[in-house]
């Protein structure tokens, strides 16, 4: 029996616009995630993906080609009334073939839980529902961490992420800011509602609001603690659904509500969820302190924000 701590890393990879991120994420995990030579022999890590990537290479290529059309990077040609041909430029064709190969190779090396396609923002909002479908499997691990698939790991991720409870990362847009109101859920009818502008704490004999806001893109902790958190957030999301409501920032809002009453054991700085669009000295210019990226959120060539509300409304109409 191995005495290594077992670490499970979970992510959602639904719809072709996100598929291409998964192989790079796996490379980053294999290279940097608890892999420093000084500690790597202490941990056994498994990457789990909830995905709708098809089994057959030709189906993967067809879905990716359709995505290129939607992005305006490929064209369609009508062959007859029933057949449409997708025309892909030679350089994009090579990229397409390589993308298929990368996905097939990745699927051989990770645990894939086949999942039906759902439109944004449902993949992120319903993440806890999906993960808890595999609760028995997840309980094989000592720690579980969730990471957005559209992230790039660029530096060593070490034992500082491991604590005696939950692990949360400060949101990069709100870290160190003073005199601001975190974007908590403002609607009292939502189960994610937070009345005060932060957690009330006492420091040097004085009471003040601790205005921390945590990012949803990297989170986790000890398995028992994280599963307990996921169950509570799943319940709260369902409660909101029953009232035909979705929290302002989806799952991230519910994560912050849970942490409001259940302080994380580990709070990571924004190095762990650092937008690639930030200038190098972003934090120095604003707040006099700098961070170097360990995990970067990647700018996408497609936009989901505008269509998110519409997709939720359509889903609500069927409930």
Task: Explain the meaning of each model-derived region.
Residues 1-123, 134-140, 300, 319:
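N-terminal anchoring/stem segment of glycosyltransferases
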Residues 14-16, 54-56, 117-118, 151-153, ...:
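Short, solvent-exposed loop/turn segments at secondary-structure junctions
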Residues 48-49, 144-148, 153, 220, ...:
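A structural signal for short, well-ordered beta-strand segments and their strand-loop junctions
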Residues 124, 128, 150-151, 248-255:
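Conserved glycosyltransferase catalytic-site signature
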Residues 126-179:
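GT-A fold catalytic core of metal-dependent nucleotide-sugar glycosyltransferases
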Residues 160-225, 232:
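PAPS-dependent sulfotransferase catalytic domain
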Residues 198-303:
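Catalytic core and acceptor-binding pocket of nucleotide-sugar-dependent glycosyltransferases
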Residues 300-319:
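Long, low-complexity C-terminal extensions of enzymes
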């Amino acid at each position: 029996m191995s005495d290594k701590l077992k670490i499970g890393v979970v992510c959602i990879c639904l719809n072709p616009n996100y598929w291409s991120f998964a192989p790079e994420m796996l490379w980053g995990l294999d290279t940097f995630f608890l892999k420093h030579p000084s500690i790597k022999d202490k941990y056994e890590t498994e990457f789990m993906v909830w995905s709708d990537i098809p089994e057959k290479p030709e189906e993967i290529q067809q879905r990716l080609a359709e995505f290129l059309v939607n992005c305006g990077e490929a064209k369609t040609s009508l062959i007859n009334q029933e057949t449409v041909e997708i025309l892909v430029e030679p350089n994009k064709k090579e990229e397409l073939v390589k993308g298929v190969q990368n996905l097939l190779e990745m699927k051989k090396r990770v645990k894939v839980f086949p999942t039906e396609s759902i439109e944004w923002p449902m993949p992120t909002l319903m993440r806890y529902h999906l993960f808890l479908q595999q609760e028995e499997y997840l309980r094989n691990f000592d720690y579980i961490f969730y990471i957005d698939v559209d992230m790039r790991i660029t530096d060593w991720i070490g034992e500082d992420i491991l604590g005696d409870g939950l692990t949360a990362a400060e949101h990069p847009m709100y870290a160190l800011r003073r005199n601001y109101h975190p974007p908590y859920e403002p609607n009292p009818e939502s189960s994610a509602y937070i009345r005060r502008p932060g957690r009330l704490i006492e420091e040097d004999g004085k009471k003040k609001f601790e205005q921390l806001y945590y990012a949803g893109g990297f989170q986790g902790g000890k398995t028992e603690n994280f599963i307990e958190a996921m169950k509570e957030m799943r319940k709260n999301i369902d409660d909101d659904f029953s009232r035909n409501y979705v929290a302002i920032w989806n799952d991230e809002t519910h994560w912050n509500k849970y942490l409001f009453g259940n302080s994380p054991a580990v709070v990571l700085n924004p190095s762990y969820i650092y937008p690639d669009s930030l200038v190098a000295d972003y934090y120095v210019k604003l707040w006099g302190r700098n961070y170097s990226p360990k995990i970067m959120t990647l700018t996408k060539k497609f936009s989901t924000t505008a269509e998110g509300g519409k997709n939720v409304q359509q889903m609500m109409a069927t409930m």
